[in-house]
């Protein structure tokens, strides 16, 4: 009999502050944050009625619909799933838990329009669609290449106004309440360094053992240094995980909005700070010719 248990639903939380949704595991289906419920249940963002029920179902070895597309259906085809990487890890059976692993997306603010990205992760991609219209023939890609009403609302709100909402305050309070119990934090975007809250957010995780910030370095030198100052002011070394996989003109094509020489200069600037460097690369037919060259150039990381 197949075992449908996965311990990630018991310790991992992903928050998308802009979309007002959470995920119990970064691959699970999203759940919209119920503002009224959270007001009445402070500190319980990781223990919503839905999450409690899903944990009960898992402990009863039931197949959870929220994990269908990313795990169950893939495993049935003999494919790898995220769940399989935690098969031999400790089994957690308590229903109410505090997350020990947090993945937070502050916003989709980003100055780049990378070739394999979309409006969900880049405001520049979204602006391109606003100006030039929806992409044709891509309607089956989960609304990534067409504007919806949520996008139109975002367009009207400045970053400051988005952060002055009830839901933003509630999420901020929840993060404060869970911060001390976190073992690892991952900050993604968009471009996290562009978010006005970045320095304050990093300070919430000052004592967290592992903090990883994902960046495309599509920012000004002033913004970069401000972010590096904040990342250096922590008890444990923060890691800056940089998105790149091409060199020269191909880099500038795939990372539209970037400049190769500026990118190299920024790498040297980062070395001045007490911040670790990693790279995350997307392998595709658009960068295959540079993949080996890039890895050779930055092999030390």
Language-model features, listed with the residues they occupy:
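Accessory C-terminal segments flanking Radical SAM cores
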Residues: 1-89
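Acidic (Asp/Glu)-rich catalytic clusters
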Residues: 227-237, 271, 299
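Recognition helices and adjacent regulatory flanks at domain boundaries
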Residues: 76-101, 110-112, 133
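Short, intrinsically disordered, charge-balanced linker/junction segments flanking boundaries
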Residues: 10, 22, 27-29, 201-204, ...
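Catalytic cores of alpha/beta
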Residues: 285-299
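Core AdoMet radical
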Residues: 99-109, 120-167, 179-196, 206-224, ...
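Short functional micro-motifs and their immediate structural scaffolds
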Residues: 76, 115, 122
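A Trp-anchored, charged/polar loop motif used as the substrate-binding/catalytic surface
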Residues: 48, 52, 89-94, 163-176
């Amino acid at each position: 009999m197949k075992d449908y248990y996965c311990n990630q639903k018991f310790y991992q939380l992903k928050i998308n502050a802009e979309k007002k949704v959470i995920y119990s595991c970064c691959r699970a289906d999203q759940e919209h944050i119920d503002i009224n419920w959270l007001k009445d249940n402070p500190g319980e963002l990781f223990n919503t009625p839905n999450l409690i029920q899903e944990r009960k179902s898992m402990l009863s070895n039931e197949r959870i619909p929220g994990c269908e597309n990313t795990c169950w259906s893939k495993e049935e085809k003999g494919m790898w799933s995220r769940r399989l990487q935690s098969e031999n890890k400790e089994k957690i059976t308590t229903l109410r838990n505090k997350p020990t692993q947090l993945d937070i997306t502050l916003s989709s603010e980003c100055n780049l329009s990378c070739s394999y990205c979309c409006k969900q992760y880049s405001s520049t991609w979204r602006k391109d669609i606003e100006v030039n219209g929806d992409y044709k023939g891509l309607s089956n890609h989960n609304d990534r290449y067409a504007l919806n009403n949520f996008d139109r609302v975002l367009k009207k709100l400045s970053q400051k106004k988005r952060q002055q909402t009830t839901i933003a305050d509630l999420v901020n309070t929840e993060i404060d309440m869970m911060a001390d119990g976190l073992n690892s934090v991952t900050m993604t975007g968009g471009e996290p360094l562009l978010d006005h809250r970045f320095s304050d957010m990093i300070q919430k995780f000052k004592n967290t053992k592992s903090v990883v910030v994902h960046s495309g370095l599509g920012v000004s030198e002033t913004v970069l240094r401000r972010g590096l100052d904040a990342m250096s002011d922590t008890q444990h070394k923060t890691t800056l995980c940089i998105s790149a996989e091409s060199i020269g003109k191909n880099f500038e094509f795939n990372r539209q909005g970037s400049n190769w020489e500026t990118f190299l200069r920024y790498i040297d600037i980062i070395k001045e700070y007490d911040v670790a460097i990693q790279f995350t690369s997307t392998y595709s037919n658009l960068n295959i010719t540079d993949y080996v060259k890039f890895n050779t150039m930055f092999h030390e990381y």
